[in-house]
């Protein structure tokens, strides 16, 4: 299985003046997955580090990258902007791609999946194409919408499965909602 995509993230965007290390615009967060409202559906919640009630309750966070992209193989224009959530292996590969190819919004990338959808053994290969002009939409802010940013009180409610999710606002159930005709929940693979 494969997809031809255009990323909405440039990759390397500069250098940290204090460390000299490259800075990237990939949205990479330490997050928790849990059913916050008793619906039976896991949500993504931003980890608060040392003050995180979810960590204290034994819910281990994981480092995740949330890549927004245009899936050029998708025929329905309303579903072309998609979100792809990846882990550490793909974070390293994306950093390698930007180091080698520069601004990733300037070229299409063919992504090839080896393995079954949903399998932990599935791997992905990335094949950047020649640079070409294409207008891409701006990447959406995910923290506060798809990634819940909860205060201590709401973290405790989430642990107990009794957080009230509302339409709009920080605890919004935006995973299936549309922003400007684009759904944040469309998945590539």
Question: What annotation goes with each model-predicted range?
Answer:
Residues 100-118:
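Elongated alpha-helical scaffolds
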Residues 114-144:
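OB-fold/S1-family single-stranded nucleic acid-binding modules
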Residues 69-71, 111-113, 128:
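Hydrophobic side chains in beta-strands
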Residues 115, 159-160, 174:
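Charge-dense, intrinsically disordered terminal/linker segments
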Residues 64-66, 103, 108, 123:
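Beta-strand-rich binding-surface signature
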Residues 1-99, 149-168, 184-189:
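OB-fold ssDNA-binding interfaces and closely related basic DNA-contact patches used
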Residues 88-92, 102, 129-133, 144-148:
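Short, low-complexity, polar/charged sequence segments that are solvent-exposed and flexible
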Residues 133, 138-144, 163-189:
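Interfaces that engage single-stranded nucleic acids at replication/repair/recombination sites
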